[in-house]
């Protein structure tokens, strides 16, 4: 199974997908979707559109020059089949992929290294130029504290109401017990009178 690259955005074109345009000089152009095909027909430059891999490589956002990338180049030279050669090639492919991923991660970390410092300096400058932002922050903090206090008061009120309800319930239970005892005493007295006659 051969996976081609989109001529415009460099994304993979799997078998049975995409569009192929063949020019008069027999040059093939494969596109992953109609969006790429339309942009190609409009003669747009892929290096100027931010969503293409060509732009990302030209702008230095992705690893563009590396020895691991040369292995993926297309070679139109047929090689005689050799079982050992195929086995070593498959092993090498997985190893090259691991190395490429490590290098891409290192490249990304190196590219993002100064971002936190730059963000901090930008925020510091913003606060220095607009000191009213700090006052807004103080107002937000005061509002949050007021909300927390109100919530705490509500919780304490609910707890006190529950305690009062429990006290009322306990008083009612005691009254019911007393009534039951009185009824039992009356029944015992009646039974005693009946036995006496």
Swiss-Prot record:
Region of interest: Disordered: 147-180
Q: Where is the composition biased (Acidic residues)?
A: 154-176
Query: Which Gene3D superfamilies does the record associate with it?
Result: Ribosomal protein L24e (2.30.170.20)
GO biological-process terms attached to the record:
assembly of large subunit precursor of preribosome
Q: Name one GO cellular component term.
A: cytoplasm
Q: Keywords assigned by UniProt?
A: Cytoplasm, Nucleus, Ribosome biogenesis
Which terms does the record give in the GO molecular function aspect?
Answer: ATPase activator activity; ATPase binding; structural constituent of ribosome
Localization annotation: Cytoplasm; Nucleus
A Pfam family hit: Ribosomal_L24e
| Oligomeric and partner information | Associated with nucleolar and cytoplasmic pre-60S particles. At the end of biogenesis it dissociates from cytoplasmic pre-60S particles and is likely to be exchanged for its ribosomal homolog, RPL24.
The task this protein performs is described as: Involved in the biogenesis of the 60S ribosomal subunit. Ensures the docking of NOG1 to pre-60S particles. Activates and recruits ATPase AFG2 to cytoplasmic pre-60S ribosomal particles.
Which protein family is it in? Belongs to the eukaryotic ribosomal protein eL24 family.
* Listed name of the protein: Ribosome biogenesis protein RLP24
Q: Which organism is it from?
A: Candida glabrata (strain ATCC 2001 / BCRC 20586 / JCM 3761 / NBRC 0622 / NRRL Y-65 / CBS 138)
Give the organism's phylogenetic lineage: Eukaryota, Fungi, Dikarya, Ascomycota, Saccharomycotina
> Which gene specifies this protein's sequence?
RLP24
């Amino acid at each position: 199974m051969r996976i081609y690259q989109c001529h415009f955005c460099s994304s993979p074109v799997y078998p049975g997908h995409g569009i192929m345009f063949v020019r008069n000089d027999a040059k093939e152009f494969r596109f992953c979707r109609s969006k790429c095909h339309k942009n190609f027909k409009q003669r747009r430059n892929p290096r100027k559109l931010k969503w293409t891999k060509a732009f990302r490589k030209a702008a230095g956002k992705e690893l563009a020059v590396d020895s691991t990338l040369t292995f993926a180049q297309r070679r139109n030279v047929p090689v005689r089949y050799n079982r050992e050669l195929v086995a070593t090639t498959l092993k090498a492919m997985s190893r090259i992929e691991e190395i490429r991923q490590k290098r891409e991660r290192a490249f990304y970390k190196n590219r993002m290294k100064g971002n936190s410092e730059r963000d901090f300096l930008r925020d510091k400058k913003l606060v220095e130029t607009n000191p009213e932002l700090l006052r807004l922050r103080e107002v937000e903090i005061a509002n949050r504290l007021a909300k927390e206090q109100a919530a705490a008061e509500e919780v304490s009120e609910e707890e006190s109401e529950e305690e009062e309800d429990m006290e009322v319930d306990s008083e009612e239970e005691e009254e019911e017990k007393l009534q039951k005892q009185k009824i039992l005493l009356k029944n015992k007295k009646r039974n005693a009178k009946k036995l006496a006659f």
